[in-house]
Amino acid sequence: MKNVTITLLFIIQTFSVRSQTVPGSIMPLNSNEFRNRIAIRELIDSFAYYADRTKAQRQAALFVENGTLEIYQSEPDTSKPIIVLKGRKELEEAFKGLEKYNMTFHLNGQNSIKFGDDTTGTVQCLAHHIFFENGKRMLQTEAIRYYDTYTRQNNRWLFVKRKLIIDWEDKRLSTP
């Protein structure tokens, strides 16, 4: 019983919003910021989930009406995007392109969110795509970083802009 009590106290202390801090930050989170961070993380994870379930319309609806997705093969500060999509209709059509894969799996990793005049974030993702090429099952893996700008509309967080940077990619034969 003593171990259960100690464990519960540890969990309560760890997740107490009054004392919670952001890694690399000395500023404690207040409960409103804590809720907003969770809501933004749900937005980020919903984007990956809808990509994997090929729900292009729902994925596009995670953006503001005139939201933008820019795709880069190197740092945005030193290069131009290879693709720019603007507005939910363009985004939805582009997201339908994931239907060409037999399966996808996007695994979101670290993320950092900064609140201010603009709410921004950085997200890391490993994207896995299974497809067939010349009768052979292939796996394409991409290490992706997103530089995001978020806004809150009608009590819901949405993407204003996502800059998708492909850090590296690997394509190989896949054996189930």
Model-identified regions with their sequence ranges:
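Alpha-helix initiation/capping motif
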Residues: E33-N36, K80, V84, L139
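Bacterial Sec-dependent N-terminal signal peptides
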Residues: M1-P23
